[in-house]
Structure formats: structure tokens, C-alpha cells
Amino acid sequence: MTISKDDQARLYRYYTEPTLVTELTRKTLALVLAGGEGSRLKDLTAWRAKPAVPIGGKYRIIDFPLSNCVNSGIRRIGVLTQYKSHSLIRHLQRAWGLMRTEVGEFVEILPAQQRTHKKEWYQGTADALFQNLDIMQRHHPEYVLVLGGDHVYTMDYTQMLLYHVQTGADVTVGSVEVPVAEAAAFGVMSVDESLRITEFNEKPREPDSMPGKPGTALVSMGIYVFSKDFLYKALIEDAGATRSSHDFGKDIIPSSISRARIMAFPFRDREGKPGYWRDVGALNCYWQTNMDLCSIEPALNLYDCEWPIWTYQPQYPPAKFIFDDEGRRGEAIDSLVAGGCVLSGARVKRSVLFFATTVGCSSLVKDSVILPKVRIGRNCRISCAIIDKGTVIPDGTVIGEDPVEDAKRFHVTPEGIVLVTPRMLGQNIYARWEDEYDG
């Protein structure tokens, strides 16, 4: 039987790539930048770091990059923390103790410790790595995978590692295409025909469109693969640059384009289509990402058994829907409802309810994100809202129907999304939960 050259190439990849991938992942150290303040999320990050914000009914944002690492076979992971990190650290301790330390696996927390002679906290993304340079070197990686802790997506990092090695890159930058109107929030890049980056501008005021694709810009995902020698040298040089802001997107990547091989890696899903990736750094983006998960066939598939999203699961009973009378029927439509929730003659439509939330009789919740342990009273109407953890909504409350009235008590975004927190209602969640409080 004659085998075509294409089939021969496929067979060769089938038998050789798994070994190569295993070698690459073993030689890779992943570092997750999780120290961001998240000021655009307003009061949602008043007492938690942005990567610790709950999402999708049962997860924290940081669970997505960490799960991507584990599912990709990358089991040496450091998480760099700084801003209001207690709830994040507590979650990492509960959810991510699954590694086998005796075989070299770990999720290690690297808090800002003023480790250099300057005695400063992390001054930027590059400085965060520089202050942990000795720890990186101690693990002897060949490649360092740098990830943001505040993005929602599923991605096999081994494909990016392979691409990095096969293209001979010093740095590989994960990239996605976004509407040019949204590109000012990201690092915008230009590439040549081989996808080598020729220009990189961090958060430009007037982003350029891609050649041949008007209205579309190529932007950075905040995901980088570095070859270790290049990274160590770049970090040391940047640390000594007095005018640097010590940031990868603002300083190291742009300044290295002329002297290093920096490649763009287009993010694709398993079918070769543009992958689902969301920066949930603003309230409207956070709300929309949760709403995306309520669609019939969401672009981000939480039900993929081959790519699970790992997390800590509190021990609550199944969700309960009670009463079946006209005007008092417990039901949820196109929604995600976590364990411990009770819908007592209430209706929920196109919403995400986190664990241990109760909704009282004859209330309606639609197009909303309800964080854990919220109590919604009777005869309430809530729409287009984000209700923070532990909030008690009094009977008869109406939210999301009158922006002017909502703005008197709550935070209302330009898109009309209403953020409600316990503090806005004069409530003290710490006093009510006592020992039950878990961030």
C-alpha cells in the first residue's frame, strides 16, 4: 500500500508531537499575573482582587488560566499577587491543592514582598517578574509562559509553545482580532506575512486597522511565551531603565522588536475558528461574559468534559424550585443556577445565580448576575443588574427599570448595567456571616 506524503507527514506528527509536547510542558514555568486592582469593576473589587471575582455561577476568573495550564500539561505554576489578595489566596489554597508536589508539580503563591534593594511593590508586569527572578531561575525553565489572571477563555497552551519553538521566536504573543473601536483598551500590533511583529503600541488612542480588514485590529491577549535567556536579559535591562514603566506591553515588547524575533500567535479553537476570549476588566464586559454563558450554545463551552474548568466547590445541596401556582411558580429559563439556590415561587430568565442564593415569592430576575449568598425578597423586579455577594434585597425592590432612580443608590454603567453591593444598601456582610464569611 502506498502512503501519500500528506499521510506520511500526519503519521509523523501523530507519533512525534506528543513526546515533543511533553518535553516542552515539562520545561515550561507558567506565571499568572494576578495582582491587578481592577478599578474599572468599581465596587465589585472593593474587597477582592480582580482575578478573585466570581464568574459563571461557580468559578473565579483565575480558574480559567489555571485550568488551561493544568489541562495543557503545565504543572509548574506561580501566581503573583498584590492588591487585596486575601480572598484570592484563600481560593487558591482551597481549589488548587490538587498538584503532586513529590513529582515537581505546584501552584505557588508569589505575593509582592519588596524583594529587591529598592524596597518597592510590583511596579508593573515586567517588574513583578523581575522581583521574582531568583525564584524563576531556581526552577530552571527553558520557557516562561506569562498569563493574565483576569481573562476568560479556554486555550491549549501547548499549541502556542510548539509554535514558539518551531518559529524560533524569542517571544511569542497570543493575539486575537477585535473591532477597532474596542482596540484602544489593548496592545495593538502590526505583523508581516510571517506573523512576525513589526510594531506594537500599548493602548493607543487611535488604533490602526489590519491591512485588508478595515474596522478590525490585531491585539495582544496578554499571553506571552518567552525563551528564558531572552527574558532574563530583558528583565535586568528594563529594571535599570529609569524612564521605563516596567511593563511588558509598554516597554519590553516595543523596545525589543528591532533586536529580537517576536511572533504573533493567532488564537484559534479546535475547529480553527477565532477562539472565545474576553477581558472582563469592566462591568459591562463582566456582565456580558456571564450572559454569553446563558445562551443555548455558548461560544465558551463549560460542559466540555475534555477541558474541565477546575475550582473549589462549597458543599451545598442541589438547587430547588418550589411552587407551581399561577403567578407563583418557581422556574428558571436560559439560566445557570448553582447549588444551594432556592427559587420560592420566583422566575429567573437569562441570568446567572451563584450558590446559596434565594429568590422570594412572585419576584422576577432577568438578564442579571447574582453572586453567592444573595437574598432577594418577595415581589421584586430585577433586570440588567449585578448583585454582589451577600446583598439582601428588600421586598418590593425594583432595579434596572429606571436609570435615574437606580443612580441615586447604586452604580449604573453607561450601558445601563446596575451594580448593587451590600454597602450601597447600608448592610454589613461581615457582621451577618460571622465565621461563615469566605471572601
Swiss-Prot record:
One GO process term, biological-process aspect: glycogen biosynthetic process
Coiled-coil residues: none
Broad class of enzyme this protein falls into: transferase
One Pfam family it belongs to: NTP_transferase
Catalytic activities: alpha-D-glucose 1-phosphate + ATP + H(+) = ADP-alpha-D-glucose + diphosphate
Listed GO MF terms: ATP binding; glucose-1-phosphate adenylyltransferase activity
Residues reported in the UniProt entry to bind alpha-D-glucose 1-phosphate: Y122, G187, E202, K203, S220
Pathways per UniProt: Glycan biosynthesis; glycogen biosynthesis
SUPFAM superfamilies with a match to the protein in the record: Nucleotide-diphospho-sugar transferases, Trimeric LpxA-like enzymes
EC number in record: 2.7.7.27
Keywords for the protein's UniProt record, in alphabetical order: ATP-binding, Carbohydrate metabolism, Glycogen biosynthesis, Glycogen metabolism, Nucleotide-binding, Nucleotidyltransferase, Transferase
PANTHER family: GLUCOSE-1-PHOSPHATE ADENYLYLTRANSFERASE, GLUCOSE-1-PHOSPHATE ADENYLYLTRANSFERASE-RELATED
Record's subunit section: Homotetramer.
Function: Involved in the biosynthesis of ADP-glucose, a building block required for the elongation reactions to produce glycogen. Catalyzes the reaction between ATP and alpha-D-glucose 1-phosphate (G1P) to produce pyrophosphate and ADP-Glc.
Family membership noted in the UniProt record: Belongs to the bacterial/plant glucose-1-phosphate adenylyltransferase family.
Protein name, per record: Glucose-1-phosphate adenylyltransferase
Species for this entry: Thiobacillus denitrificans (strain ATCC 25259 / T1)
